[in-house]
């Protein structure tokens, strides 16, 4: 089992016993990251909320900042972006396809964009699809039938003021884990949402999760470092970097 440091925190936090996910990167740069963070990042009683909208310096920069043993988080905004990204990203580079950012002005099912099905290859250790918390079973079916065998549940929960993250995702992640493990036991599920302590990871493991992703807990780097070490050192969970 593997512990991931979710994007965007994986851009900054690197641990020997966890895999950092960098990004999320888009085909073309989307400037204005600092401004959007200041304007929209807020802590609420339901969790952290943001409306950053995939602001980033583009895939070319992202590739320079991502090590071979890390995972490159990417997203398509235009209908040819998957094809354009696939032509740039090395065939052996591990990726996470973010199909569900709720913070864009336009929300489309990017699994219908050309080239989405070209990403699974035998050369990638990780070829993950990060799905929305409200993902329908038909969407999950489609992703698996296209050849993807690693699914991350889930992205932030959309609200009118931006995406919410944290423990509020738990019931959605639980629903997705249960469905995938019932229908497709060969699919590896990465569980995320509210993991702040080792027992949170154990809870997801008991539901059937294969791996874990730590996100907003990373706002406290020392605490997340301790949590990663506790998860890796707990024999009842048995997590280790693979």
Write out the residue ranges for each language-model feature:
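Glycine/Thr-rich beta-alpha phosphate-binding loop at enzyme active sites
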Residues: 99-112, 133, 138-187, 218-227
């Amino acid at each position: 089992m593997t512990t991931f440091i979710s994007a965007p925190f994986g851009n900054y936090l690197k641990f020997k016993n966890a895999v950092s996910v960098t990004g999320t990167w888009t085909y073309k740069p989307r400037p204005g990251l600092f401004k959007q963070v200041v304007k929209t990042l807020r802590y609420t009683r339901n969790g952290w909320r943001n409306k950053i909208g995939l602001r980033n310096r583009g895939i070319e920069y992202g590739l320079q900042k991502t090590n071979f043993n890390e995972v490159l988080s990417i997203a398509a905004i235009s209908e040819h972006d998957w094809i354009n990204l696939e032509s740039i990203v090395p065939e052996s580079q591990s990726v996470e396809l973010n199909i569900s950012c709720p913070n864009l002005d336009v929300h489309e099912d990017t699994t219908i964009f050309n080239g989405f099905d070209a990403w699974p290859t035998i050369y990638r250790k990780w070829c993950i699809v990060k799905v929305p918390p409200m993902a329908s079973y038909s969407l999950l079916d489609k992703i698996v039938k296209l050849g993807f065998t690693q699914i991350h549940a889930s992205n932030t929960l959309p609200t009118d003021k931006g995406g919410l993250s944290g423990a509020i995702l738990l019931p959605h992640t639980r629903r997705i884990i249960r469905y995938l493990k019932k229908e497709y036991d060969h699919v590896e599920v990465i569980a995320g949402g509210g993991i702040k302590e080792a027992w949170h990871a154990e809870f997801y493991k008991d539901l059937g999760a294969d791996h874990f992703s730590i996100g907003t807990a990373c706002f406290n780097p020392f605490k997340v470092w301790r949590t990663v070490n506790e998860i890796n050192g707990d024999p009842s969970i048995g997590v280790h970097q693979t």
